[in-house]
Design a protein with these regions (language model features):
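Flexible loop/turn segments at secondary-structure boundaries
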Residues: 14, 167-168, 190-191, 215-216, ...
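Conserved short alpha-helical segments that host acidic/polar catalytic motifs at enzyme active sites
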Residues: 1-202, 208-272, 277, 344
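Conserved hydrophobic/aromatic pocket- or pore-lining residues that grip, position, or stack substrates
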Residues: 207, 259, 274, 284-288, ...
Length: 461
């Protein structure tokens, strides 16, 4: 394992920063570390063996003219870094990574897909934390893969995270004059700096340091998680179930309401009416329609459904939805169906609970077009289904239509476009984890999603 530390000097005195680096490195080398590396702003120095004198600290023409920020990182280990990317990025690691085999498929990995694991994690973490400004999701991502501590220096700021298991110690402190702050993975640094007020960084905590704002605790993830299957709120929950004091029916209406609010504001959706297919997304349709009408007053508040596969008169439905004849809008076999004159030459929204294999959606779209609709937009209450565990293995057909796009699309917009072409729809709008969790009323952190789905979001927000 390694020893890591980060130092921020709030004064313009370079010598103070250098002295803290020297003392930190020398103290940590007593633990038998052989390889050392220091980064002060954009200046880098490294070596193997005992740490030499101050002359090995990176110089800037003996002044501070090229130092934009009085901050830096230190790293010590018994061996040279495992990851070559440490030579080009401002990241130090004390610990190891887990479950990294499929990181190259992550929707946010971008051009780092073929890089080493540290660089992949650095790029995704930076994109979530810096580019998207989502500290909670950034820390959740790290927590999936990090066992230990990771510290990153970027644009004059230090970010240090301790994973929620508390696998490795991490301390932070500021001197009594509020002139220097330190984050370190070794408790032994308390010895050379008796004037520092050190305290333990809690597991799951993200610390930020910069010269303008000092040391800040940005976020603390819960150390325990109650993971809930979000599919329960789409289909499987018992009708008497409650969440946050509300019945499951009201929760499902809210899922539709939140999705309508998002799509009407942040997408190019254009529909005149929306209908559920089959029966179980009807609450989502009611919530969706009521909210959508707040944005589009002429929207038709129809409560009919396109197809009721749960009509007990059709016993075949209990055995195979692929074999049974779906009772579509023109058949009249269902007690609930919409009439041709209600939808002809209109832009119709098709509210689906999920899209699994796509068979149901394709057939419904076929019949809608047959009766003369102007366009069909498929609105999916659930997130993309790419794993049988997401739908309780409800279908024995494992060829989930979205599965082949894992690692192929960086955003929900692109996935929507590809799936719409496969289904023959004009448009498709999947729900996203963040929008779905808002509708359910439970933090994304406590809902279970496969990693690729968890970080697949809409770009335009």
């Amino acid at each position: 394992m390694a020893g890591i530390f980060a130092i921020t000097n709030y004064t313009a005195d370079r010598e103070i920063l250098v002295s803290y680096f020297i003392n930190s490195l020398q103290m940590l080398q007593h633990r038998g570390k052989a390889y050392w590396k220091i980064i002060i702003d954009n200046l880098v120095s490294s070596g193997i063996g005992p740490f030499p004198a101050e002359s090995s600290i990176p110089k800037s023409d003996n002044d501070n003219s090229n130092l934009r920020y009085m901050i830096g990182l230190g790293y010590l280990s018994k061996r040279i870094p495992r990851f070559r990317s440490m030579n080009k990025i401002g990241v130090v690691l004390d610990g190891f990574f887990v479950d990294i085999e499929k990181l190259h498929l992550h929707p946010l990995v971008g051009d780092a897909a073929n890089a080493d694991s540290l660089y992949k994690i650095y790029c995704i973490f930076k994109k979530l934390l810096i580019d998207q400004g989502n500290a909670e999701k950034a820390c959740e991502f790290l927590d999936r893969h990090l066992r230990g501590n990771l510290t990153m220096m970027y644009d004059g700021k230090i970010y240090s995270y301790r994973d929620s298991t508390g696998f490795k110690p991490l301390v932070s402190g500021t001197d009594k004059n509020n002139s220097v702050s330190i984050i370190a993975s070794e408790n032994s640094l308390r010895i050379p700096f008796p004037n520092m007020n050190f305290e333990d960084v809690r597991p799951g905590q993200l610390i930020k340091m910069d010269v303008e704002n000092g040391q800040q605790k940005i976020l603390s993830l819960p150390t325990t998680r109650t993971m809930i299957d979000p599919f329960e709120f789409i289909r499987e929950s018992h009708v008497t179930a409650t969440i946050n004091g509300k019945g499951i029916y009201e929760t499902r209406k809210r899922i539709g309401k939140v999705q309508a609010d998002f799509l009407s504001t942040h997408s190019n959706i254009d529909i005149d009416a929306a209908y559920a297919e089959p029966d179980y997304p009807r609450p989502m349709n009611l919530g969706f329609s009521a909210e959508y009408r707040n944005h589009i007053p002429k929207f038709d508040l129809g409560e009919a459904i396109i197809n009721d596969r749960y009509d007990d008169s059709d016993r075949m439905i209990d055995f195979s939805e692929n074999i049974s004849k779906n009772k579509m809008i023109t058949s009249g076999k269902s007690l609930k169906y919409i009439l041709k004159h209600k939808i002809s030459q209109k832009n119709i929204g098709l509210i689906q609970g999920t899209i699994q294999t796509g068979i149901t959606a394709k057939e419904t779209i076929y019949y809608l077009r047959k009766v003369g609709v102007k366009s069909v937009s498929v609105i999916v209450s659930y997130v993309p289904s790419v794993d049988g565990r997401q739908v309780g293995l409800y279908t024995h057909n494992r060829e989930l239509i979205a599965h082949k796009y894992i690692g192929q699309v960086p955003s929900l917009e692109e996935l929507n476009t590809r799936i719409s072409k496969e289904l023959g729809a004009n448009k498709v709008f999947y729900n996203s984890p963040s929008i779905l969790s808002k509708g359910i009323g439970i933090s994304e952190y406590n809902l279970w999603f496969p990693e690729w789905v968890r970080f697949l979001e809409y770009e335009k927000k």
